[in-house]
């Protein structure tokens, strides 16, 4: 079955092409740390031959606690992104939370991301669609895979069909997430075979019911990522940090930066194997 290709500059993203890595840090903690993390990702992905897009947030507007670190903000964040692009020649993905942010962010980065908690907000979707940028839609934890076609349709109505879908788990009772591996193929089907990627970092979140920040299951990142890659996906979304225990956001789910290369070697091996298989239709 023909898969839709979404191009991020010279990077082609599709379910039947070699996977693209969307990776970096959860939030911009500082200019220097962003440079360090980006350089490491670029070095490793170039060595392994993996297409790469750097990820970081300039503002985490959905933190659990009013006291949690949010990021440097729009103006300073865009300056850091511009420096990363100039220094490393890297493509960049970041999220927007308000319609007014869409165009200023799209003027700097290569992919703008619709956060899971906001994925049904039509005004935000319309503003993002109008930019003409490549869009990454995070599937809300409370939305079934089959409902993602409606969100894609909103972007199409806004004149933008350059849409990537991203699964980051589904609510499983209170304060826990699980990943439905059957959901990936459903998301492909309802979106006209748009690229589907897997955010393994945020799928590992597991909250303390009474805590002010998300917990996580970093020790299980490799197992969960292996399972997702075995489905046959367009890309993998992974955040890493040189010192996860002291990261300002989602450290418990972050991959230790020093483990990035061996981790990606495994992901590439699985991706190469799965995409070497002939398509097998078992529906009839």
Swiss-Prot record:
BP terms from Gene Ontology: keto-3-deoxy-D-manno-octulosonic acid biosynthetic process
Molecular function in Gene Ontology: 3-deoxy-8-phosphooctulonate synthase activity
Pfam family name, one: DAHP_synth_1
Pathway stated in the Swiss-Prot or TrEMBL entry: Carbohydrate biosynthesis; 3-deoxy-D-manno-octulosonate biosynthesis; 3-deoxy-D-manno-octulosonate from D-ribulose 5-phosphate: step 2/3; Bacterial outer membrane biogenesis; lipopolysaccharide biosynthesis
Keywords tagged on the record: Cytoplasm, Lipopolysaccharide biosynthesis, Transferase
Reaction(s) the record says it catalyses: D-arabinose 5-phosphate + phosphoenolpyruvate + H2O = 3-deoxy-alpha-D-manno-2-octulosonate-8-phosphate + phosphate
Domain of life: Bacteria
Entry's Gene Ontology cellular component terms: cytoplasm
Residue ranges crossing the lipid bilayer per the database entry: none
InterPro entries, sorted: Aldolase_TIM, DAHP1/KDSA, KDO8P_synthase
Protein EC: 2.5.1.55
Protein localization: Cytoplasm
NCBIfam families reported in the protein's UniProt record: KDO8P_synth (TIGR01362), PRK05198.1 (NF003543), PRK12457.1 (NF009109)
Family note: Belongs to the KdsA family.
Protein's UniProt name: 2-dehydro-3-deoxyphosphooctonate aldolase
Species, as recorded: Escherichia coli O6:H1 (strain CFT073 / ATCC 700928 / UPEC)
Species classification: Bacteria, Pseudomonadati, Pseudomonadota, Gammaproteobacteria, Enterobacterales
């Amino acid at each position: 079955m023909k898969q839709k290709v979404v191009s991020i500059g010279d990077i082609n993203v599709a379910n039947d092409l070699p996977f693209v890595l969307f990776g970096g840090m959860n939030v911009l903690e500082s200019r220097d740390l962003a440079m360090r993390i980006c350089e490491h990702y670029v070095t490793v992905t170039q060595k392994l031959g993996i297409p790469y897009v750097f990820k970081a947030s300039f503002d985490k507007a959905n933190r659990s606690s009013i006291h949690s670190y949010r990021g440097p903000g729009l103006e300073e964040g865009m300056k850091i992104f511009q420096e990363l692009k100039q220094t490393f020649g890297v493509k960049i993905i970041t999220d927007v939370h308000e319609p007014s942010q869409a165009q200023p962010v799209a003027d700097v980065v290569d992919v703008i991301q619709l956060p899971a908690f906001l994925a049904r907000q039509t005004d935000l979707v319309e503003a993002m669609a109008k930019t003409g940028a490549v869009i990454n839609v995070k599937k809300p934890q409370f939305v079934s895979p089959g409902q993602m076609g409606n969100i894609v349709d909103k972007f199409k109505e806004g004149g933008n069909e350059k849409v990537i879908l991203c699964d980051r788990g589904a609510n499983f009772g209170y304060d826990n997430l699980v990943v439905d591996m059957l959901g990936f193929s459903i998301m492909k089907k309802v979106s006209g075979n748009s690229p589907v990627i897997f955010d393994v970092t945020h799928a590992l979140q597991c909250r303390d019911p009474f805590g002010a920040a998300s917990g996580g299951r970093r020790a299980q990142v490799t197992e969960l990522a292996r399972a997702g890659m075995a489905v046959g996906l367009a890309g993998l979304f992974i955040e890493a940090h040189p010192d996860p225990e002291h990261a300002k956001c989602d450290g418990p789910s972050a991959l230790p930066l020093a483990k990035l290369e061996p981790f990606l070697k495994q992901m590439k091996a699985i991706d190469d194997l799965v995409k070497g298989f002939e398509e097998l239709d078992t529906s009839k």
